[in-house]
């Protein structure tokens, strides 16, 4: 339904060949509606297998040439993790400085070669300086869950969290609150390595109503989603969380689960704005009070679930494509 898509991908040599094919087609009269690109998690110049900047201009020059032919160019900029002290953890200082310099080079290049910079949230735009000409547009993640989720009874309160447990994923206050409400239960799904690193901090806070499991991929996660009636993104606030748009938020929505979130985070703002669950302060007392309410009033879980189900289609990947098409059409001056 999106028409014909031409792909420029692969290593530098493969991209060079594909770029030539595209430019020849443009000269022959082919009309391209727009160009959409996505940044790597690495700096663009370091994405070759050897991680050396052997082709520092090629990709940016291609995007600039497309703009000169009047083709709107948009790029999704994935993350600014590199601007935070946490980026340096486990990375040799020299490599860290080189990578950060190359990330800054990317931002300078975007000033010349883009019309639209797509970001997971507009708040992230405060950390990304690409000049005034380039338009910043929010394009959060989506979900690809086509099947209608099976309804889960609202009682007993059964919660599910899937994700990391590192410094950006601090769930300790929430775990302590869950342990104080025996009528509720929480299942944490995380990687074995992350659990081994975190268990000394978490186990003293956990009661018998919290269990840790390890599953990977949609199929393995299905039974845990099916058993839960509420999903959890109740991490302690962090400057990075102010704008971070985790994929898990939209995976939870796709699975039809209302969400417990924390104030002072992007997730909390979305949950509050769209009435997709509950947003509270990140404290043991606040979490415990909410859990007591939900165990005593399961109808509130049912009502929140209905609202999430009503919003599911607004947060699919297909809906995101419609959004980016609209944004790029708006800057087309042909």
Residue spans for each PLM region:
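Nucleotide-activated donor-binding/catalytic signature segment of Leloir-type glycosyltransferases, i.e.
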Residues: 190, 197-227
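Nucleotide-sugar-dependent
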Residues: 169, 219-224, 229-251, 261-269
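Membrane-proximal helix-turn-helix segments that form the acceptor-binding/catalytic region
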Residues: 57-68, 83, 96-116
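Conserved donor-binding/catalytic core segment of Leloir-type glycosyltransferases
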Residues: 149-169, 175-179, 186-190
């Amino acid at each position: 339904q999106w028409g014909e898509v031409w792909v420029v991908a692969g290593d530098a040599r493969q991209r060079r060949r594909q770029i030539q094919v595209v430019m020849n087609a443009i000269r022959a009269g082919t009309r391209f509606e727009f160009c959409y690109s996505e940044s790597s998690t690495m700096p663009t110049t370091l994405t070759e297998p050897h991680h050396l900047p052997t082709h520092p201009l090629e990709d940016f020059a291609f995007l600039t040439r497309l703009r000169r032919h009047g083709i709107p160019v948009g790029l999704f900029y994935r993350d600014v993790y590199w601007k935070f002290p946490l980026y340096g953890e486990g990375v040799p200082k020299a490599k860290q400085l080189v990578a950060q310099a190359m990330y800054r080079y990317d931002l300078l290049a975007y000033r010349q070669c883009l019309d639209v910079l797509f970001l997971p949230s507009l708040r992230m735009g405060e950390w990304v300086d690409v000049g005034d000409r380039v338009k910043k547009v929010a394009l959060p993640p989506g979900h690809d869950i086509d099947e209608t989720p099976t309804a889960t009874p609202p009682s007993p309160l059964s919660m599910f969290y899937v994700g990391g447990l590192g410094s950006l994923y601090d769930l300790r206050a929430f775990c302590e609150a869950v342990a104080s409400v025996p009528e509720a239960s929480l299942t944490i799904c995380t990687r074995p390595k992350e659990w081994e690193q975190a268990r000394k901090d978490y186990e003293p806070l956990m009661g018998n109503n919290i269990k840790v499991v390890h599953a990977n991929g949609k199929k393995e996660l299905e039974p845990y989603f099916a058993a839960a009636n509420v999903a959890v993104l109740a991490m302690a606030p962090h400057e990075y969380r102010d704008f971070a748009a985790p994929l898990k938020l939209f995976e939870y929505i796709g699975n039809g689960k209302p969400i417990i979130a924390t104030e002072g985070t992007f997730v909390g703002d979305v949950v509050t704005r769209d009435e997709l669950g509950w947003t509270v302060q990140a404290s043991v007392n606040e979490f415990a009070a909410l859990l007591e309410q939900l165990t005593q009033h399961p109808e509130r879980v049912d009502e929140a679930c209905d609202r999430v189900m009503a919003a599911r289609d607004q947060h699919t990947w297909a809906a995101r494509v419609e959004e980016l098409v609209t944004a790029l059409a708006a800057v087309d001056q042909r």
